[in-house]
Every structure is written in structure tokens, then in C-alpha cells.
A protein has these predicted regions:
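Short glycine-rich, flexible loops that bind phosphorylated cofactors or substrates
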Residues: 62-63, 92-93, 110
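A conserved, positively charged/aromatic
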Residues: 28, 76-78, 102-105, 109-114
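N-terminal strand-loop element at the rim of the active site
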Residues: 8-13, 19-64
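A short, charged, and often flexible helix/loop element on the N-terminal side
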Residues: 49-85
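Short His-centered aromatic/hydrophobic patch
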Residues: 85-91
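Short, charged/polar "capping" segments at the starts of alpha-helices
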Residues: 41-46, 93-94, 113
Length: 114
């Protein structure tokens, strides 16, 4: 099983949302997948059509990242997870686990000398 931890997931529209959806959909053909995503209005109809589990986390943005990390850490205690795939380093920063982590980096997230 793999967890996908993301701040960007449909039905919200965007490039990263499409990427994370496609990644979850394709991986779910061969692996158990559970997605932890931020709450978005009108998500229920979309989520019901997915072939994998999607858990939405709401609340104020400042507190949401801590709540999401807590829920993921609790889930990891009860489940056999091979790895965690994240859309951004901020989706991983508060997790307290030694599970393998795969982080998609893009744009200006890569700091290097010019």
C-alpha cells in the first residue's frame, strides 16, 4: 500500500491536481492507494467515483497541516504502508515516520547556485 499526501487534488482544477489524480489512478491499478487531501467544496461526488480511498482534511490552513500529519501518523500505526508519495515537501514536513518518502519537486523548489 502507498499513501499519497497532497494539498492539490481534484475536483480542484490545475496542473498539480491533474498530476496527483493521474498518479493515484494509475498506481491503484497495481497497488492499494489511500489519498490524504485537503478538503474542497463539492468533493463527495468526485471522491465516490474513485477506485481508491480518499480522506479529506479540512479546517483553517494553519492548523490543517498539523491535523493532516497527525491523522497520517495514526493511520501508519495501524496499516502496512510501503511508502508515502507527496506533492510538495510541505506535505511531508510534519510526519513522524521512517517510511520511504517520495516527493515530487517542481518549479522554484529546487535551490541551486547559479
Amino acid at each position: 500500500m502507498y499513501l499519497i499526501v497532497t494539498r492539490s487534488f481534484p475536483p480542484e482544477i490545475g496542473g498539480m491536481q491533474s498530476l496527483m489524480w493521474s498518479l493515484a489512478r494509475e498506481l491503484s491499478k497495481n497497488f492499494m492507494i489511500k489519498v490524504f487531501a485537503d478538503y474542497i467544496e463539492n468533493h463527495k461526488t468526485f471522491d465516490e467515483q474513485a477506485s481508491f480511498s480518499i480522506e479529506r482534511i479540512g479546517g483553517p490552513k494553519l492548523l490543517r497541516k498539523y491535523r493532516k500529519a497527525y491523522l497520517i501518523d495514526e493511520y501508519l500505526k495501524e496499516s502496512k504502508v510501503n511508502g508515502i508519495i507527496a506533492d510538495h515537501w510541505k506535505s511531508l514536513e510534519h510526519l513522524k515516520t521512517n517510511k520511504k518518502k517520495y516527493c515530487l519537486i517542481h518549479g522554484k523548489e529546487i535551490n541551486h547556485a547559479k
